[in-house]
Amino acid sequence: MSLNPRDVVIVDFGRTPMGRSKGGMHRNTRAEDMSAHLISKLLERNGKVDPKEVEDVIWGCVNQTLEQGWNIARMASLMTQIPHTSAAQTVSRLCGSSMSALHTAAQAIMTGNGDVFVVGGVEHMGHVSMMHGVDPNPHLSLHAAKASGMMGLTAEMLGKMHGITREQQDLFGLRSHQLAHKATVEGKFKDEIIPMQGYDENGFLKVFDFDETIRPETTLEGLASLKPAFNPKGGTVTAGTSSQITDGASCMIVMSGQRAMDLGIQPLAVIRSMAVAGVDPAIMGYGPVPSTQKALKRAGLTMADIDFIELNEAFAAQALPVLKDLKVLDKMDEKVNLHGGAIALGHPFGCSGARISGTLLNVMKQNGGTLGVATMCVGLGQGITTVFERV
């Protein structure tokens, strides 16, 4: 396809190996260092991109405190080859933070406010816990269901509303680990994982080029034996069918179609459309349905036109209703999360939006797809979606 000057193109994507938050490979690596390493290596890999041209580093991060505080985008950028004259901002849309970072860069390019951007995100959930420093307003319960901030309970609610069984969830969780392991063995993650140093279980420093979160030994029987994690009496959502708590970062180089053509760069993809949407916080995980419908309408497409889909696996009980109402549940094995998802790889909040987008682009490239959708739910009732076309 030919590019228009203000088209938004993805030049390259990379991510860290996903590390377990409890005693994992990144336990002695700070979030800023993880981010800076990733940005530096991705720029090194793309020699035609001059770091001096970077308009802004836009980095997603949810818990912006401790080592992730004081604008971690700038903290990380200062430790890379990007000059001090380039800007940096940290953004949060909870789970959708780094996809929002991508959207912010895209909107700037579309409106002529820059040509080259570095976007992505990080979350070190081992160093900065999910609830560190959080003080929810008790008056929120006057406006939304009291349990709306407990993501696992919103997944229970959504699963119950849509008749999702425990066995269906366990099968979905098993699928995630099996596909992620298969992708690892077959080298499908080779282009997206940027190797980095970390510590193994014995405390030895080594270079990791694989995700340590995947459990190939997972069985249906093992998953069936797990107790409910959020609703002890009658619940169906378990640790085995929920996204893992992990540490990781993801990064993309994004630019205008004109600049890519000027530099002789063959992009991975162009953004066709973007959308966000809100839903009742009590069914937080349903957000990808309206946001995807909105994005497809903006692109003049239907779900039947889409070759591959990456849906963030916050919970199996959440993902299955979304796939059902997007009318792709019966095509899941052909189109959806072909390299596994967050149940196997984890969901470091600030990292995941760019991570699923980049993984989607690799799936499209490896399987000859043209159109793809990356979408995810967002805590407290939102959805965010990006439609990509491979070029």
UniProtKB/Swiss-Prot annotation:
It is found in: Cytoplasm. Coiled coil: none annotated. Pfam families: Thiolase_C (PF02803), Thiolase_N (PF00108). Its EC number is 2.3.1.16. Heterotetramer of two alpha chains (FadB) and two beta chains (FadA). Catalyzes the final step of fatty acid oxidation in which acetyl-CoA is released and the CoA ester of a fatty acid two carbons shorter is formed. Belongs to the thiolase-like superfamily. Thiolase family. This is 3-ketoacyl-CoA thiolase. The lineage of its organism: Bacteria, Pseudomonadati, Pseudomonadota, Gammaproteobacteria, Pseudomonadales. The gene is fadA.
